[in-house]
């Protein structure tokens, strides 16, 4: 058992925040542009909201239709053991974009104007220090990328462009799927139509402005399949009108269900609606690919599909994500997220990677792919998995780690390919240990089983070490 060393790829030991990262729009010397013979590839990051890897056809789901995402995975690489650090939208996205974990970037829960005190749910605002965090968009913008953001920001002020983005179209937090209010480069207006399709059109407008002369980074953060489940086009509901969802393993509402009891009252009916939202998202993929092809940008564009967290949709008798239960849960359905990479002629097709990777590995991987330094002083605990992505062996002296970690409020997790340990309240409990080799659905808590004490204690020490290395 081991935990990752933080800052392993930093270019210096200097403290780095957004203020000393960018001065007058120019990168400071620590992250100055590097000369490069070949043009850097473009990057399109497609982020779903509440899409677990188990909800995709390529992830084994036999009832929800995702042919386009499945095809991207088939023609590229899919990490089947990718886990979000936090099963909640705002902290997970902050980790995805910064490579830092909640105790570092300060967003501990989903951001809402109405947090609940008991049990704690939601966070009123990002801490003031978050504006000084260095996001991937800051790095790429400072290194010559044209950066565009479209969709659900979830990290605070979404009215004006943030963190190095030049093009900005953000939907508000209400997630109204029909006739939504969208802020485009500082001007908010209600727009007619279906939100998901409107966001794809906004992404297309950004791509229409791009040429091969300058690389670009586009984030398309879709609200699908997050509730509310109304407002999607009728054709998607019709697809699932008779679906039984017998294979999804849903259960009646659990005694510790905290939220979403209205969805659990009609689990099959609401699974039909959730599936409709997933397929509506899936149908946006070919539209984005067609626009890239039309602009002559497809071959030099890396496409990544991921999500902030998953949803249970009735598994374990719960509906949403980490806060679906009291205490917070870290089930694979909510921490297991897609991580699909597609780059024609570069990423080997039909690649299914078994290594355990995390959301906090994304920024280091992109930086290595684009030949850019990882921010110095950021205390990043992630590691680039670019060699794995490209089907190349790692150095024998530097094998891939076996364990990833998670944190959500008072709950911490360590997971490898065999075990998952969940510690709450700094180990005071209630705690859980699952032997995933014989219990993949996480039904049998082995925490107090004498047979597993060595494994449990080894993972607990790993969490303690990770906690120390990610402090501050």
Identify the residue ranges that each predicted region occupies.
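Active-site beta-strand termini and strand-to-loop segments that position acidic
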Residues: 414-417, 424
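Active-site segment of extracytoplasmic enzymes that catalyze sulfate/phosphate-ester chemistry
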Residues: 46, 52-148, 167-174
